[in-house]
Every structure is written in C-alpha cells, then in structure tokens.
Design a protein with these regions (language model features):
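N-terminal secretory signal peptides and thylakoid transit peptides that target proteins
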Residues: 1-16
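Short, well-ordered beta-strand elements
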Residues: 29-39, 57-61, 85
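Extracytoplasmic "Venus flytrap"/periplasmic binding protein-like
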Residues: 51-120, 152, 156-163, 251, ...
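Hinge/lid segment of periplasmic solute-binding proteins
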Residues: 91-144, 169, 196, 279-283, ...
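Short, solvent-exposed loop/beta-turn-alpha elements that line the ligand-binding surface or hinge
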Residues: 106-120, 187-188, 204-224, 271-292, ...
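Extracytoplasmic/periplasmic solute-binding protein
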Residues: 131-140, 145, 166-215, 257
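Glycine-centered hinge/linker elements that transmit conformational signals in sensory
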Residues: 171-176, 212-241
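C-terminal lobe and pocket-closing loops
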Residues: 264-278, 288-381, 412-414
Length: 414
C-alpha cells in the first residue's frame, strides 16, 4: 500500500486529534463525519452540508491542508469507518483511490443525474477526478493560482505587472522596504511550497518528471528555476518559510507585502472590510510566463463508511448544486457550465477575468499518486536551497535521488 509519509511531529499531532475523527464509541449514533481542508469557499460548503438533509447531523471538521491530509491518511489507512465524507483535491485524490480508500460515484451519479443537474459539470472538470474510467469526487471548485499585486502602489510608482520572472524580481526589489516586503512567498512544506515550486519548475523549466516518472527538476533548467526563486525570496515577508496560504492571505490583507502568487479562492478576502486593510487596492493578472498551478477540489465518500451511500451522496450533491455554487461564486471559479457562462457573475466578481486567464495558462500538478509523498522531501530540500543552507544543485540532486529511491520502492521503473 502506498502511504503518505508523516513527520514525527505530524504523527503526534494527528494521533492526539484522531479520536474526534476516528469516532469509535464516542461517535454519536447516526452522525455523519466530514473532514476537509479550510478556506472561505470550503467553509461555505461545510455549512451547506450541515443543512443539506433536515434531521441528519453532519459534523464538519476543517483545517489547513497538510493537517487534513495527515488526519485523513491516518483514518483511511486504518480502515476506520469515519470520516464518511472526505475532502479531495485533483492531486491528492489519486493517492486515496490507488489505496482503495474512496468509493466510486458512478452509480450514484447516474441515479441522481437529473435531480441535481449533474450534466452541468463539463467532462473537462469531471476528468480531473476520474481514475481508470471511474469518477470518485463530486467537483465543488475550480481554482487557479493568480498573480496578486498592489495596484495602488504600482500606479503611484508608474509600474505595470511583470511579464517575466526577471521583471518580477526587479519589481520586488524596488518595492521592498522595512514597511512591507516586495514579495509574498508561501514556502511552508508541503502543499504551499509545492504550489510555488510548481510554477517555477514549469514556467522556467520542463516540470517535475519525464514521461516515465524519472525526476527532471534537478536538470539545468530546474536549477536555474530555483536559483530565481532564491533571488526573489530575498524580498519576501518575514517567516515565509513557515507561511502557507492562510499566512500569505493575511500578509496581503494587513499590508505586509506587495505582490506574489496566490489562489483565486483567496481573492475575495482582499476586499473584506472586516479583515482587510487594503480593500480595493489589490488587483490580479495571470502569473508571469504562465504555468502556475490550476486544478480543483471537491468531496468523496469513504470506502469504509457504514453510512447510507445515498444519504452521503445527497449531502455532497446538495452542497454542489447550482444554487449552492452560485452562492459561493465570489469565492471560487464555478465548476458548472451554467455558472461559468453567467455574465452577471462575471461582472459581479472583479477577479474573474484574471482567474479565468490564469486557469487557461495554468498547469496541473503531476498525476502521480505518490506526488505529495515525494513532495515532502523535495520541498524541504528546496527550502535548504532557498535559505542558503545547501547549494541549489546539491539540494535538487539530493531530492531527485530520494524521489527515485522512494518511487522505485513503490513499484516504479520496472
């Protein structure tokens, strides 16, 4: 069985939290358990799940991505009958499916196709969550990493958004000051650092792997890509090596940084007067040179759940209904055709043009079930390079060797 590698600290934290998720005797009779990553759109969908079926109790637990991934892995690898409903990204679901942890949804999809207007999800969206011809995840969002920048500061300085990494580096240097960083970097392992490295490796290099899953991120182009990341990181906010999406979103909201890469699902929060000091001052464009991460996420049914699968499907389908996603349209890129083509929604959400442009030029992460497992040590080696602890070439070569050894041990390169 392929299992995600968990650090000692993560194992301890996850084990302490496990009783709430694994359920056991403490589980309330009939209560449906859902575990999820957390950001504004997913908080909205969690509320929709809690109220989806009158008289049915849904306990939702939301947390940062890496912690959710650890806890889901512990529960599923032990074949616990909770959680029942599980968050999945377009990248992470591959691991769960390969391990036999998700229930295929095809029969339920066909059964409820008309009631929930499921044909409104285009084939291109469903394909993101299909493995060996079977669908495993109900799509809830499309997402793309955009380039966030302070349009007020750019305007005052007579600058325009960068079109290349060289321009990005030079602008970050010019805006950097004790008051605010020229750049906002999110390099906390694993997920956040993967997001940023993915952009550099694909825009400046040839990606992570060749067609046979041999690492290529340590070739000459890959080394140059991380050298550029290292240069730009000189102008990042304090604590960037421990910053994930939440911390970077706050850095923009609190006027700590000028520009950088971030998810479209974080755009609306820039204009939240209750949390943001820079309302109306952020704008967005497609990332310089394209190839930043794009994808989506949604919810699946555990293969080990003892709850009625029809009930579980109705809960996730209700949360992903046309009406539900319309209500969250300011927090995401809608995965339904009817909403993507809705001109009223496009006009009401000023980040849509940049989000759609970013999605069009984006690149998904590799469809490798073990991607996040190898990503754990790849991103930590990248941090060693960016912080100057290790030379870039040496760090990437070490990561490539570790990746090769891991994948060879999991049946690759036969």
């Amino acid at each position: 069985m392929s299992r995600l590698r968990l650090g000692r600290r993560g194992i301890i934290a996850a084990t302490l939290a496990a009783p709430a998720i694994l359920g056991g005797r403490a589980r309330a009779a009939g209560t449906i358990q859902m575990i999820s990553h957390r950001y504004p759109a997913l908080e909205y969908f969690a509320e929709k799940m809690r109220t989806a079926i009158p008289g049915t109790t849904v306990n939702t637990q939301l947390m940062p991505y890496d912690k959710a991934l650890e806890l889901i892995t512990i529960a599923m690898s032990s074949k616990s009958d909770t959680p029942d409903i599980v968050y999945a990204s377009d990248a992470g679901f591959q691991t769960f499916v390969k391990n036999g942890w998700f229930r295929p949804l095809d029969d339920l999809w066909a059964k409820y196709r008309d009631e929930f207007k499921l044909d409104d999800f285009p084939d291109s969206v469903r394909k993101n969550f299909t493995h060996d011809g079977k669908l495993y995840v109900m799509p809830h969002t499309l997402n793309a990493m955009m380039f966030f920048y302070r349009k007020d500061l750019f305007g005052a300085a007579g600058k325009v958004p960068p079109k290349s990494f060289t321009e990005y580096r030079d602008l970050a240097k010019s805006f950097n000051s004790p008051m605010r960083s020229g750049n906002v970097s999110c390099l906390k392992p694993v997920d956040a650092a993967i997001n940023e490295a993915h952009w550099y490796f694909n825009a400046l290099g040839d990606g992570w792997f060749d067609q046979d899953w041999h690492p290529i991120f340590n070739d000459a182009k890959g080394v140059q890509a991380i050298e550029m990341m290292k240069e730009i990181a000189q102008y990042a906010q304090q604590g960037f090596t421990a910053a994930a999406n939440d911390e970077c979103m706050i850095a923009y909201q609190q006027d700590i940084g000028v520009m950088g890469l971030q998810w479209a699902t974080r755009a609306k929060a820039m204009d939240d007067p209750a949390k943001s000091r820079i309302v109306g001052k952020i704008d967005w464009v497609a990332p310089p040179q394209g190839h930043a991460r794009m994808g989506g996420d949604g919810y699946a049914i555990s293969a080990f759940s003892k709850q009625d699968p029809d009930t579980l499907f109705r809960i996730i389908a209700t949360s992903a209904s046309q009406a539900s996603i319309r209500g969250a349209a300011s927090l995401l890129i809608p995965p339904r055709t009817s909403l993507l083509n809705d001109q009223e929604l496009r006009q009401a959400n000023r980040f849509y043009p940049a989000a759609l442009a970013s999605y069009e030029v984006g690149t998904p992460v590799p469809s490798l079930p073990e991607f996040y497992a190898v990503g754990e040590f790849i991103t930590r080696r990248i941090l060693q390079a960016v912080t100057g602890e290790t030379a870039v070439k040496q760090a990437l070569d070490t990561a490539a060797t570790e990746t090769t050894d891991f994948l060879k041990g999991h049946g690759y390169y036969k």
